[in-house]
């Protein structure tokens, strides 16, 4: 198998298609779902998906997404924004021999505190962020944003199901159909 990179991010999906004025009038808060994706930047396909409720932080889903992606593919690099800047994530990537292309927070301190890999990433990014971006091909992270955009444009920004289990199944099905469309347009399907 060819090694792949993955870009990880999350986005919100409305649980209702009713207008915002209904929520305002009746003071009903419907909330939203969070869809967490790992996308292969070269093929643009969703490699892994997790669906959670709105109160789950992106960082908590990094490990399940990565492990699911590793079970199906040989992952060589993982992209993530500042929400995934955690020592545990850097350690997980290092333990599996995966190159970390995670943007650290602006106020990050270059101290190891249990993660030498993160310390090196902080020092590298603080020294020259533009060079780091080019070396890591950090722009490839946008492939996951493109996947969210396509899924929302094709299938809508909401789910039709009422129960959480069925909402998760619906979003997984939408991601699978998105992959099918990508394969068809790229001539692989």
Question: Language-model segments: what does each one mean?
Answer:
Residues 31, 107, 121-123, 178, ...:
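Intrinsically disordered and other compositionally biased segments
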């Amino acid at each position: 198998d060819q090694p792949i990179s993955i870009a990880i991010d999350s986005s919100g999906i409305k649980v209702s298609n009713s207008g915002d004025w209904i929520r305002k009038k009746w003071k009903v808060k419907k909330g939203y779902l969070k869809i967490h994706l790992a996308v292969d930047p070269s093929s643009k396909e969703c490699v892994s998906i997790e669906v959670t409720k709105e109160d789950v932080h992106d960082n908590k889903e990094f490990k399940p997404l990565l492990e699911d992606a590793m079970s199906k593919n040989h992952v060589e690099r993982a992209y993530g924004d500042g929400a995934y800047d955690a020592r545990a994530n850097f350690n997980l990537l290092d333990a599996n021999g995966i190159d970390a292309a995670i943007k650290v927070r602006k106020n990050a301190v270059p101290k190891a505190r249990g993660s030498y890999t993160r310390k090196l990433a902080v020092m590298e990014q603080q020294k020259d962020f533009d060079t780091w971006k080019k070396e890591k091909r950090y722009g490839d992270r946008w492939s996951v944003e493109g996947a969210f955009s396509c899924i929302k444009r094709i299938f809508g920004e909401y789910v039709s199901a009422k129960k959480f289990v069925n909402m998760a199944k619906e979003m997984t099905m939408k991601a699978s159909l998105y992959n099918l469309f990508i394969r068809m347009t790229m001539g692989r399907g």
